[in-house]
Amino acid sequence: MKKIMTICLICILCGSMVQAQKIRIKTGIEVLKEQNFKCLEGKRVGLITNPTGVDNHMKSTIDILHEAPNVNLVALYGPEHGVRGDVHAGDHVTDMKDASTGLPVYSLYGSTRKATPEMLKDIDVLVYDIQDIGCRSFTYI
């Protein structure tokens, strides 16, 4: 009887592992892409992100939205470390232009820790893409 129970338990565990491997988790940017960015169409889009904002191929959300023909990405907002992760911990992030896209990058970790009305004046919708597992505190969450 003990042997039969052990075999049953092994079969159940193996079956669960096979099933778990078939499930694919999608990031928010992948869902938006699958929907052809329909909810962003016709809007001026601002993106709050950092280097964790990527799809399953590690492509930056900045680049994905910038390259999408029906998305009007007009500004980026960078928390600590900046939108591309090129600022050291604790250093102030300054407003600048993104070298890759030419878009304005507004700092959320410089003289202000939140977007000002001036930073938001040309934005219809904000997309927030910062991935985290939620077990630590950060200045940008």
Label for each model-derived stretch:
Residues 78, 128-129:
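Redox-cofactor binding/interface segments in oxidoreductases and associated redox assembly factors
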Residues 72-81:
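Short internal beta-strands
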Residues 132-141:
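Glycine/threonine-rich flexible loop motifs
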Residues 23, 81-83, 92-94:
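A cross-family phosphate/adenosyl-ligand binding-site feature
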